[in-house]
Amino acid sequence: MERRIFGLETEYGVTCTYRGQRRLSPDEVARYLFRRVVSWGRSSNVFLRNGARLYLDVGSHPEYATPECDSVADLVAHDRAGERILEGLLVDAEKRLHDEGIAGEIYLFKNNTDSAGNSYGCHENYLVSRHGEFGRLADVLIPFLVTRQLICGAGKVLQTPRGAVYCLSQRAEHIWEGVSSATTRSRPIINTRDEPHADAERYRRLHVIVGDSNMNEVTTLLKVGAADIVLRMIESGVVMRDLTLENPIRAIREVSHDITGRRKVRLASGKEISALEIQQEYLAKATEFVERRGGDQTAKRVVELWGRVLRAVETGDLDPVAREIDWVTKLRLIERYQGKHDLPLSHPRVAQMDLAYHDLRRGRGLYGLLERRGQVDRAATDPEIFEAKETPPQTTRARLRGEFIRHAQEKRRDFTVDWVHLKLNDQAQRTVLCKDPFRAYDERVERLIASM
């Protein structure tokens, strides 16, 4: 596909503490967080003026789904806009708590595991053609996705019976299948539930649930950008070496537990190969593909960065990518902290630091602190993120949804929307079905808006 629709859905961890003790249950915190949303949206599941969806997911996890984006750069800005919107809800909820005489601080974490061992995800969505072979797509993608954590993991200190280990990925321990139609019970790498949110005769939505939530914009750019290039190669019929893994679920854990990328995983053919070698194989094909096809600036940046990360892992000198890749940034922070205070990796203060990296509250979260000090690289600007909080992407269906919502709210009209429907809840119950996610202008929607 020359143009592709991308979307990210991020579930956030939530807690409320007072002097280190848990103050409210996650359910109660979530209710406070969403009270403002419910007051104007009459629901804890709403679509916003920027085309995004904000809702309370299973287990009291606030979830933000970006609007449909047709560029990875746009997606990065809209993902960050979601963080800012949730941070606004957090500030509001804390004020309300204090007004009611409840002391405590609310925390929102953009991570993937809590202290009780529960996991929540960052789901990537890629629109693909209905006419390709979905099975082949999965076969080629799974070895890539299993080893992709080497270039875009969020990093995690994992406590094991044999002591603490620093892992590449937070999500790896919680993936139980290769391909499946469930997302919570079995947690596959690729979810096959067929909900394209588009014309089902033309499109499928590839739903990848194996990735970590990233704090660094550049890591997000690489995560989605590299997957997009691999998808384009498959769609273009690029011949790939058969790297089918004997046991993807065992492999994903083995890869996560080895930050050198050298541990061998077994292929279905019986051959053994390292995560680094698998990624190098995909990168070589991707570089050649982008050069031959003449990719855009983002594709060129992705391939260049991908190469630098793999070189850093191969040489063992991670410093050249410490400003760009989450797991490396966090590892360096932890190593400095350990050195300064002479602490083992298993120390509770190290675990606290691991968590603080993902704290969304600017001025308190560790990642936000690094960003303010200019110690990490960016892939979006603050004005772009600010604009994305209110304004949908202008080249996709999200524009139609955002415009419809804005006008309906300004005219105080009752309405219902989802990814494909726009409906005015008046006597006529007029509804427009928007099946084409690439279509940003539609006379039917304009007529519906004009009729308000």
From Swiss-Prot:
Keyword Nucleotide-binding assigned: yes
Pathway per the UniProt entry: Protein degradation; proteasomal Pup-dependent pathway; Protein modification; protein pupylation
Single GO MF annotation: ubiquitin-like protein transferase activity
Active site (UniProt): D57
Record field: catalytic activity: ATP + [prokaryotic ubiquitin-like protein]-L-glutamate + [protein]-L-lysine = ADP + phosphate + N(6)-([prokaryotic ubiquitin-like protein]-gamma-L-glutamyl)-[protein]-L-lysine
Domain of life: Bacteria
The UniProt record lists the keyword rRNA-binding: no
Sites where the protein binds ATP: R53, T66, W419
Keywords in alphabetical order: ATP-binding, Ligase, Magnesium, Metal-binding, Nucleotide-binding, Ubl conjugation pathway
Record's signal peptide: none
GO biological process: modification-dependent protein catabolic process; proteasomal protein catabolic process; protein pupylation
Binding-site residues for Mg(2+), renumbered to this chain: E9, Y55, E63
Its EC number(s): 6.3.1.19
Family: Belongs to the Pup ligase/Pup deamidase family. Pup-conjugating enzyme subfamily.
Misc: The reaction mechanism probably proceeds via the activation of Pup by phosphorylation of its C-terminal glutamate, which is then subject to nucleophilic attack by the substrate lysine, resulting in an isopeptide bond and the release of phosphate as a good leaving group.
Function: Catalyzes the covalent attachment of the prokaryotic ubiquitin-like protein modifier Pup to the proteasomal substrate proteins, thereby targeting them for proteasomal degradation. This tagging system is termed pupylation. The ligation reaction involves the side-chain carboxylate of the C-terminal glutamate of Pup and the side-chain amino group of a substrate lysine.
Name the record gives this protein: Pup--protein ligase
Organism per entry: Salinispora arenicola (strain CNS-205)
